[in-house]
Amino acid sequence: MKIAVCIKQVVTRDWPLRVDDTEHWVRDVDAGFEMNEPDAYALEEALRLKEQSGGEVIACSAGPTRVLQVLREALARGADRAIHLESDSLAAADSLTLAQALAAALRPEEPDLILTGLQSDDQGFGQTGVVMAELLGISHSTIIMEVRLDLNGKGEIRVKRELEGGWFQWVTMATPALLTIQSGINQLRYATLKGIMAAKKKEILKVAIDSSVESTQAISRIYVPEKEKKTRFIEGTPSQAAEELVRVLRDEARVV
């Protein structure tokens, strides 16, 4: 089975947020970067499926040269090869633009299964995987908690979806298919020294992206949430103050 995993590089979660001068994105010049956590679970699930059925795992990521960091990490964890969509503009691209680029890169590979994280830690749209499946003309399923391979030779998979209110749904799907993986589906593995050394010899295919491609989505402004503190003194007798406090909590704060 050929499995492709789409991985995004995001700013580390402990990095203090700074907005750039344009107020259209964060100032990431001096930031640290890491693999998007939901994508790390997607990669781990792909590696486990490969261990069950054989085949290969292809890691794919879009962005500037620094994206090679997460691709090498994926190779060190066990991916067989990688595809780098080299473009400075794709790092903060909207879901449609990114999905179009990823779909174009993966279409020639004809993977049996494409895995993505449920959403990215930076933008959190949760749309890229679904849009990519539509562009490729393949079935998809979201918020996956478990994947079972078909051992009867029918080319099907059975997946467990997380629904609202603690409910789950089992779905049988034909391949090729795309799945968006929920965080916590498995236990992440760490790259071993042997894996790190082996990753240096694995192929990373660079795919040039048209620099004139523009996002269809325009970000008006990014800003740090403004915190406002207001102090109100409630006067009157204890019973009057208590009655007024309950009214404020119920009608204004809406917490009771």
What are these regions (language model features)?
Residues 1-256:
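N-terminal glycine-rich FAD/FM-binding segment characteristic of electron-transfer flavoproteins
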